[in-house]
Amino acid sequence: MTKRLNRRSFIKTAAIAGAGLALIPNKAFAGNKKPIPTEGKVRIAFIGVGLRGRNHVSNISKNPDVEIVAFGDISADAVAEAQKIIKADGRAKAEEFTLGPTDYLRLLKKPNIDGVVISTPWEWHARMAVDTMKAGKYAGLEVSAATTLEQCWDLVNTYEATGVPCMILENVCYGRQELAMLNMVKKGVFGEVVHARCGYLHDLRGIKFNNGVEYGTKSFSEAQWRTNFSEKMNADVYPTHGLGPISLALDINRGNRFLSISSAATKSRGLHEYIVEHPKGGENHPNADVNWNLGDVVTSTIKTSRGETIIVTHDTNVPRPYSLGFKLQGTNGLIEFDGLESGGIKQPDGSYLNTDRIYIEGKTEPHEWESAAKWFKEYDHPLWAKFEAEAKNTGHGGIDFFVDKEFVDSIKEKREPELDVYDAAAWSAVTPLSEMSIQEGGEPQFFPDFTRGKWMDRKAVDIK
């Protein structure tokens, strides 16, 4: 068990609280303007430079079109690490904002900032993005974008009042397999899509606890804040990694929308057992008495306006390998894969047996699965073919390169990002709505129409 603790990556080291700024309308961004290249470099600041934030720093620092101007974090040590990254890339030292939890507001007042990447704990995401948009700066917001319906509406309302874009930085939308799946959908491989499945299935016990089995104030990194959600909420608290790519495939907010969600949760056993069985835990450890609210597996069924269903699973408290559990099914066939180019099943010789599979009527052998490998290759997205060499050494198998590139490009071209504020609101709304559904015994909860009817006329995302 100790080995599991040591092999995890920890991110988002500090919570940064926020307060509102005066509303600063920016009509230059209102509506869907044609791309207008900016003069000079795109000036980027970062709020939150823990491990996740520093991953963004590392990626964006390699972009020659960018000037990195500021870091904000309550941890001076985290900022010092971020400074080392840009110094190694030959960049000048960025201005630092480390005077306390509201010092990011001083950062946002700086006139020499075009966009802000926000990588802080979930509960601060929405308020910081709202303040960023009010300051007239593009907001690049880590996932999930919001934890309440009120926060979802705050994001949308602020965008519509200011015209300043907000991009949800959902990196899995740029996964090679995920984009190949999207390509297959666009080219009609599956026929008319009727059903999908996705989720976040990831053993996070070694992230939710450290220093043995500590969390909160006695721990560090994500365990300081993420574990609190397992104690306080019974919901799908992290839906966007799986739901983002599926939403693009189903044209959510662009000709289709989520209508309702019905959710159920299992009992909670995994975190308690982890504590009592850990060498530094035990039955007498104070945390053995914690009443964990989050069910070990949360399952939600979403219905869409076009008649598809989506099953979304959250599974982070019990032992398991990583998976995003993708399935997409249409009138011609279906595909199933774990996502992020999972290695598959490890063989005795150390190699891996790929388990990605596809069935297309009339194209594959009747009633038999076929490896999806050649299909992924045939429908490889042009984005990957063009930028594979640049992406290969960046985070999460290259997908972080693409999400950061899109954020910077959208600022440079003065356009809406491919993943916008309506996506941020709709995908993140799964958390509060699933919580309400579980509390009401699985009763369906209805999604607000965050687009206020615009989903009927908005065009499908054209990732390029």
Task: State the predicted function of each range.
Residues 14-18, 29, 55, 247, ...:
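C-terminal helical cap and adjacent loop that interface with cofactors, partners, or active-site loops
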Residues 300-306, 330:
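Active-site beta-strand termini and strand-to-loop segments that position acidic
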Residues 48, 52, 162-167, 172-292, ...:
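Predominantly a Rossmann-like dinucleotide-binding segment in NAD(P)-dependent oxidoreductases
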Residues 142-144, 170:
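Short beta->alpha connector loops at strand-helix junctions that form conserved
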